[in-house]
Amino acid sequence: SQSKVFQHIQEATGEIAAVEDLSKYADWRLQVANIPAIITCTDLMAKQHPELVVAYMKGMIRVGRWANEHKRAAAAILNKQTYYLDEDDTYEGIKHVDMVPNLSAQNIAMVNIGKDFMLKQGYIKNNFDVEKWAAPEFLAQAGKELLEGEIAKKKMQKIPTMQGRVG
């Protein structure tokens, strides 16, 4: 088994047979079946409406931040669509996971490993450059716009108001 999730199902139901618990190994590449969730859109959408892609990414960043700050509530939501046994099990599975989308070197490497496997097995027909395909400009722009908005909001909070002044 490549994840604790399937190990739990196997233990609870006996429907899945574990051959090896790869989560015991320190090498993260052995657990690449846990490829990070990939957010995609069509090439046409990216070219014709980049502002919509950036707006969507801003929403995904906000959702990730919320999930990081509210892991129990996030676990309750995610439990409805995962293979975990229950909300507590889901929480244990996500409590150390950063839910904010990112294009870290490790995430790109994990996607590359998954892509190479799917290419070798014939699930995808055309090879491609994962770093270029990831289109980092959308996530970067979304992060920049969110930061600019947060800075502007903080500046506005520091401006004194004239409310309540007499004379």
Where do the model's predicted regions map?
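Conserved C-terminal helix/tail region of periplasmic/extracytoplasmic solute-binding proteins
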Residues: 119-167
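Short, structured secondary-structure boundary patches
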Residues: 20-22, 39-43, 109-111, 142-151
